[in-house]
Structures are given as structure tokens and as C-alpha cells.
Amino acid sequence: MGCRSRSVQSTRKCHTLLPHLWVMSKVAAIQAAFESGDAETLEELIHDDYQFISHVGGMVLGKSDMISIAGSGGVTMENHRILFENDEIGIEHGIAHFANGSTSEAVLTFNRFKDGKLILSETGATPISDDYQLIGQD
């Protein structure tokens, strides 16, 4: 079942987005729009000065970069959950899988909001592989 115009779908439910009113959490709305490739909704929810900081080779992506990646299948999330959210920040965790064959990662994301929109996302990630060992493990 698809969602009507001006709605986003997450976990089999449609959530209507009204101008300047969040009907679901900001993080959930952005994640749902990203997964579905809803560029119009992302355009509304992401601040023009947005930065995505991944710490991979000093890479920083902007709003247009994130919107162009949305819905492409380049990154898919599993077990996504929101750990904390208020009007200023949101913290989320999930398992990221990459279409290019890179090792999947457990990703913790810190999000900051400004003027009601997402302005910053910064991630920390742990590779998930069969041979990965914590320090001190034999």
C-alpha cells in the first residue's frame, strides 16, 4: 500500500505531514522519507545549511547530496530505532547495509535541529564482520 501525497510511509504506516507541523517524530519522518526517496518531503524537512559528517575520509555531504542518495538503495537500514529526541536533537541507531559491498556497520547518529529542520547529522560506526574482535578478546 502506498501513501497519499504529502505523506510518508514507515513500518507499514502512513503519516501525514502538514506544513510546519510534525505528526510523527522528526527523525522518523526524515528516515521514512529517505528510505522511500521522497525528495519533496526531504526538501521541507532538511535545513538548507545541512551537513552530514560521516568521518570517512573527512567526507561532509550537504542537503542536495543527501536528497540525491535518498531512495537509491545505496544505503539501507535495518533495526532502525530512535534512542532519544526532543526539539533540539535526535539520536538514532541502526544497521547500515551498503549496495557497493562495503562491510555493514552498526551506526549511531547524532542529529541537530535548527528552525524546526535537520541541520546536522554526525555518525559513529562499528564495522560488522565475522572477524571483528573487541580489544582484549582472544
What are these regions, as identified by a protein language model?
Residues 1-22:
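N-terminal amphipathic/basic-hydrophobic helices that include classical n-h-c signal peptides
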Residues 2-3, 28, 39:
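Residue-level detector of transmembrane insertion/anchoring sites
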Residues 36-51:
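Short, well-ordered alpha-helical segments enriched in acidic and aromatic residues
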Residues 8-10, 43, 100:
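Residues at secondary-structure transition points
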Residues 14, 24, 29-35, 51-53, ...:
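A beta-strand edge to alpha-helix "cap/lid" segment located at domain peripheries
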Residues 20-21, 45-48, 111:
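Low-complexity, intrinsically disordered/propeptide-like segments
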